[in-house]
Swiss-Prot record:
GO terms for cellular component: cell projection; membrane; perikaryon; plasma membrane. It catalyses: D-glucose(out) = D-glucose(in); D-galactose(in) = D-galactose(out). Residues 33-64, 112-118, 175-183, 291-304, 353-363, 421-429 are extracellular. This is Solute carrier family 2, facilitated glucose transporter member 3. Belongs to the major facilitator superfamily. Sugar transporter (TC 2.A.1.1) family. Glucose transporter subfamily. CDD domains: MFS_GLUT_Class1. It is a multi-pass membrane protein.
C-alpha cells in the first residue's frame, strides 16, 4: 500500500460534510438563549388569537413542546438513515436533505411575521428530522473516505462541527447580536445559510468509494476517487478489501434492524454501539449545557451566559485536542479516561453546589468542575461514539447500525431533557450523583467489552467479531477485545 496523504480534495470533502454536524450543534443550542423572548411571543400570539390570556400551564407546555419536538424529529430522522444512503448514496443523501433544513428554517424564520405558533413547532420538528439524518450521514461518509490510519482523527471532525455549532448558537443568541425581540426569528432561521452553502459545494465532493464499489460495482470510479483523495496511486490493497467485502455481502441477505439483534455476528457490536451512544447522553453533558446558565447562576456567577459560552469554548478546544490524541492513544483508552474524569468532576459539582452557601470559594470549584467535566467529555464520550459505530460494521449492516445507534442517542437525549428538570427539582445538588452512577457503569462496560479499532481495516474488525481469523489475531496482535490501544498502526499517512 502506498503512503496515504492528506490532500486538498480530502480536506474539502471532510469540511463540507461537517457542515451537517454544525447544523446539528447549532439547532441544539439555538433555542436556549431566547427562551424568555419566545415565551413572550407564544403568550402574545395565543392572546391575539383567542382574546383570552393563556394559562401558565399552556405556555409551559407549548415551550416544552417547541424544545422537545426537535428530538422527536431527530429520532425519526436517525432511524431513516438507511432508506437514503442505500438508495441514493452518502453524498447525494446529504445534498437532498438540505431541502428539509431550508423548509424548517423558513418556517421558524417567518413564524413571528405570520403570528403562528404552529409554524415554529413544525419548523423545529422538520429541522430535527434533518439533524437526525445528518447524525447518520456525516460520520458514515467521513469514515468511508478517510485513510485507515487517520480514520479516528477525521472521525472527530463530526464532533468538532457539533460543538462549533453549539458555540456559534450561544454567541449569536447574545442580546447584542440576535437574541432580541426583533431578531430571534433570524436566529432560528440562520440554519438556511449553511444548508445553501453545503448544497452548492457538495456536487464538487466525491461519492463514498466504498458505496460506489460495494453497492454499485463501479470499481474504476472508486479507484480513481481513492487515488485523488489519498494522494497515492497504489490503492490496490484497499480496493481488494472492498471487493472481498462485496463478495461476502453478495452471499448474505440484506441486513435489517432486527437482523442486527438476531445474528451473533452483529449482536455484540450493536450492543456496544448502543451503550456508547448512551454513555454520551447519560453522562450528564446535556444536563450541564441545557441548564448551564442556571447552574452558573446558582454558583454565584453574575453574568452566567458568558460563563456558559466559556464552557462552549472549552468544549471546542478539547475536541481539537481529541483529534490529535485519538490515533495515538486509541479510542478505547480515551473513552475510559473521559468517563473516569467526568465521574470525578460530577462528584465535585455535587459537593460544591451543596457547600457554596457556606463557603464562597466553592462557587469557583463548581465552575472549575464544570469546565473540566466538559473537557473530559470531549476527550472521549463526545467524539468517539459517533465514528466508532461506523468502524464496528461492514458495508452491509452499517446503515442499519447507524440508524439504531442514532435513534438511541436521540431518544436518550430527549429523555434527559424531559426528566432532568424534575430530577433537579426533587434532588437538588444530588442530581449529578445519578450521572456519576451511569458514568461508572459505562466505564466498566468499556473496559470489558469495547474493542480497540485504531489502525484496523473494516474487514479486520468485522472478522474479529465473526470469530474468523482469531488464531492470526492472537499471533499478530491479540483478540480484538483485548487489543492494546497503544500498539503501533500498520498504515502510514502524511500531510
Amino acid at each position: 500500500m502506498g503512503t496515504q496523504k492528506v490532500t486538498v480534495s480530502l480536506i474539502f470533502a471532510l469540511s463540507i460534510a461537517t457542515i451537517g454536524s454544525f447544523q446539528f450543534g447549532y439547532n441544539t443550542g439555538v433555542i436556549n438563549a431566547p427562551e424568555t423572548i419566545i415565551k413572550d411571543f407564544l403568550n402574545y400570539t395565543l392572546e391575539e388569537k383567542s382574546e383570552n390570556l393563556p394559562t401558565e400551564v399552556l405556555l409551559t407546555s407549548l415551550w416544552s413542546l417547541s424544545v422537545a419536538i426537535f428530538s422527536v424529529g431527530g429520532m425519526i430522522g436517525s432511524f431513516s438513515v438507511g432508506l437514503f444512503v442505500n438508495r441514493f448514496g452518502r453524498r447525494n443523501s446529504m445534498l437532498m436533505v438540505n431541502l428539509l433544513a431550508v423548509a424548517g428554517g423558513c418556517l421558524m424564520g417567518f413564524c413571528k411575521i405570520a403570528q403562528s405558533v404552529e409554524m415554529l413547532i413544525l419548523g423545529r420538528l422538520i429541522i430535527g428530522l434533518f439533524c437526525g439524518l445528518c447524525t447518520g450521514f456525516v460520520p458514515m461518509y467521513i469514515g468511508e473516505i478517510s485513510p485507515t490510519a487517520l480514520r479516528g482523527a477525521f472521525g472527530t471532525l463530526n464532533q468538532l462541527g457539533i460543538v462549533i455549532g453549539i458555540l456559534v448558537a450561544q454567541i449569536f443568541g447574545l442580546k447584542v447580536i440576535m437574541g432580541t425581540e426583533e431578531l430571534w426569528p433570524l436566529l432560528l432561521g440562520f440554519t438556511i445559510i449553511p444548508a445553501v452553502l453545503q448544497s452548492a459545494a457538495l456536487p464538487f465532493c466525491p461519492e463514498s468509494p466504498r458505496f460506489l464499489l460495494i453497492n454499485r460495482k463501479e470499481e474504476e470510479n472508486a479507484k480513481e476517487i481513492l487515488q485523488r483523495l489519498w494522494g497515492t496511486q497504489d490503492v490496490s490493497q484497499d480496493i481488494q478489501e472492498m471487493k472481498d467485502e462485496s463478495a461476502r455481502m453478495a452471499q448474505e441477505k440484506q441486513v435489517t434492524v432486527l437482523e442486527l439483534f438476531r445474528s451473533r455476528s452483529y449482536r455484540q457490536p450493536i450492543i456496544i454501539s448502543i451503550m456508547l451512544q448512551l454513555s454520551q447522553q447519560l453522562s450528564g453533558i446535556n444536563a450541564v449545557f441545557y441548564y448551564s446558565t442556571g447552574i452558573f447562576k446558582d454558583a454565584g456567577v453574575e453574568e452566567p451566559i458568558y460563563a456558559t459560552i466559556g464552557a462552549g469554548v472549552v468544549n471546542t478546544i478539547f475536541t481539537v485536542v481529541s483529534l490529535f490524541l485519538v490515533e495515538r492513544a486509541g479510542r478505547r483508552t480515551l473513552h475510559m479516561i473521559g468517563l473516569g474524569g467526568m465521574a470525578v468532576c460530577s462528584i465535585l459539582m455535587t459537593i460544591s453546589l451543596l457547600l457554596k452557601d457556606n463557603y464562597n470559594w466553592m462557587s469557583f470549584v463548581c465552575i472549575g468542575a464544570i469546565l473540566v467535566f466538559v473537557a473530559f467529555f470531549e476527550i472521549g464520550p463526545g467524539p468517539i461514539p459517533w465514528f466508532i459505530v461506523a468502524e464496528l460494521f461492514s458495508q452491509g449492516p452499517r446503515p442499519a447500525a447507524m440508524a439504531v445507534a442514532g435513534c438511541s442517542n436521540w431518544t436518550s437525549n430527549f429523555l434527559v431533557g424531559l426528566l432532568f428538570p424534575s430530577a433537579a427539582f426533587y434532588l437538588g445538588a444530588y442530581v449529578f450523583i445519578i450521572f456519576t452512577g451511569f458514568l461508572i457503569v459505562f466505564l466498566v462496560f468499556t473496559f470489558f467489552k469495547v474493542p480497540e479499532t485504531r489502525g484496523r481495516t473494516f474487514e479486520e474488525i468485522t472478522r474479529a467479531f465473526e470469530g474468523q481469523g482469531q488464531d492470526a489475531n492472537r499471533a499478530e496482535k491479540g483478540p480484538i477485545v483485548e487489543m492494546n490501544s497503544m500498539q503501533p498502526v500498520k498504515e502510514t499517512a502524511t500531510v
